[in-house]
């Protein structure tokens, strides 16, 4: 009798118990909701005993995996700090503005006057406009974002980490 369950035990040995419990619950609810006549007719048509139950179990397993991945994705999204979300959504042009800051830690950024990228970053609250001089504007990286940039910057990928 134990030889029948050995392959199943090996299959589910690396699966989290929570996912296995979800699979069993989905499997039970699906079998309970599907009419008995349909199950009997399906197994009689295919002439393979218990095929319908095996298919429903496989379906339950896939649904449980999908829901656990979806839940993990949603948790990961909502566990991010608001500042981290802003940094993750920066474009390549916006990240290029901070190249000097990320290398040296210099909080002052210079750019040509009326630069649209700088205006976007100012609206996002990442930088503050300090002064203008001949064809040049000076900006300061805010203290809050300078901390998060240093914390989440990955110099290898040249992106901010999650």
Curated annotation (Swiss-Prot):
GO cellular component: plasma membrane
InterPro entries linked to this entry: SieB (IPR025982)
Transmembrane segments: 22-42, 48-68
Keyword DNA-binding: no
Subcellular location: Cell inner membrane
Keyword check for Hydrolase: no
Taxonomy, superkingdom: Bacteria
Keyword tags: Cell inner membrane, Cell membrane, Membrane, Transmembrane, Transmembrane helix
Membrane protein topology class: Multi-pass membrane protein
Signal peptide range in chain numbering: none
Protein name: Superinfection exclusion protein B
Organism: Escherichia coli (strain K12)
């Amino acid at each position: 009798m134990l030889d029948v369950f050995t392959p199943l035990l090996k299959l589910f040995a690396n699966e989290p118990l929570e996912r296995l419990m979800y699979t069993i619950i989905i499997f039970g609810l699906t079998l309970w909701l599907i009419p008995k006549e349909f199950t009997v007719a399906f197994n009689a048509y295919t002439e393979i005993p218990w095929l319908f139950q095996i298919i429903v179990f496989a379906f339950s397993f896939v649904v449980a995996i999908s829901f656990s991945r979806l839940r993990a994705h949603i948790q990961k999204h909502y566990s991010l700090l608001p500042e981290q979300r802003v940094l993750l959504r920066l474009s390549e042009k916006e990240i290029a503005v901070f190249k000097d800051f990320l290398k040296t830690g210099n909080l002052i950024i210079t750019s040509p006057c009326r630069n649209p990228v700088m205006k976007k970053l100012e609206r996002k609250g990442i930088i503050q406009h300090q002064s203008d001089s001949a064809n040049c504007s000076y900006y300061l990286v805010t203290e809050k974002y300078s901390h998060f940039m240093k914390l989440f910057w990955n110099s290898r990928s040249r992106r901010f980490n999650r």
